[in-house]
Amino acid sequence: AAADRLHAWWAGDGSALNDSDKLFSKQLPGTDFEKSVWAAARRVQPGSCASYGDIAGVIGVPRGAQAVGNALRRNPVLLMTPCHRVLPASALEAAKRAKRLGGKPYEAVGGFSGAMTGPLTDLKRHMLIWEAERFGSAEPALF
């Protein structure tokens, strides 16, 4: 089931992972807060992005951006819960500005899976670019 969805997503079906929470939500380890963050992150569509603060607002903790980042760092299923689509507000604004000016979006992406630099953040950047090219809008937008 999960493998089939990943294959469909890789083949270009941007909606293949939309309801992945049905596969995992009750089985995932984590606190209720972490699970609410992961559920909100799953609502961010391919080719779109949200900020940590956006996710915090959606789950009812408007000043909880840092806690959202910490919860995403503990995400146990990286592609099925697309935490790579969640960026610091400054990186989201920089990506929007770069797109308007014809530059490269996603030069700054924040952390990924606990790393702030290096191969994991490079992977996050490449996933964002790949999804924007594959599934449409490179314009960062919430949900």
Predicted region positions:
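Short glycine/serine-rich loop segments
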Residues: 63-119
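Basic nucleic-acid-binding alpha-helical/helix-turn surface characteristic of O6-alkylguanine DNA
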Residues: 1-63, 106, 122-143
